[in-house]
Amino acid sequence: AVPLTSYALTFDARGGYRSGSHAYETRLKVSNGWENGWWGSLETDSWNGVHNNSNEVIGLSYNELETNYTIKLDDKWSLKPGMLTHWSKAGTRFGPYLKLSYDVNPDLNLGIRYRYDYNVYRSTDLDGNNARANQHRWDGYVTYRINDLFTAAWQTTVYTYQNDFHYNNHKKWATENAFVLLYKMSKNITPYIEYDYLDRQGAYNGRDNISENSYRVGVSFNL
């Protein structure tokens, strides 16, 4: 999903539904940014069900801690090294990343990010061996402030397994595309809607390789 970034303490509540997997999601997130460049967040995400592929843990309920630091290169370019720590019933995953951001103008921002997801735990691969389902992940970002009230964002993602695993689309790689529209209702309240196309990664009643759409509604509060 597209991150909602601010330089104040923020509480974000979001609900979602995946049409292919027939799964409902609830996420609660607290984040804070500091003027010295540091940013951090803590979130918990719960599902009413999980995917049926034992090697695909994306549908598990989880908790996530993230932190990053912005390095200003000049008035338009910035680097953002960060670390994501993700834990669920399956185990713990670390995701170090580096993001490059460019402000085209005050209303338009572009970004690219590389993240390496390292699983502390092991899973059963396609050959029946115990291995780590580590991933390479590339993200692209476009954020555009339409006017004082509306902001639109697009995030595109490609990720690949490092080892001998497949996603629910029966491939070693998969894609995601997320589109978000935010409405600044007031200084402290910003509701938003989000649509994601998650490739053919749906799984339901023992079937996978199902076209997956995600529909989300949320609201962000500056505290």
Give short role names for the model-derived ranges.
Residues 74-80, 91-165:
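Detector for outer-membrane/organellar transmembrane beta-barrel domains
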Residues 153-186, 190-198, 204-206:
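Outer membrane beta-barrel transmembrane domains
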Residues 22-26, 30, 59-65, 92-96, ...:
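Residues that define the transmembrane beta-barrel architecture of outer-membrane proteins
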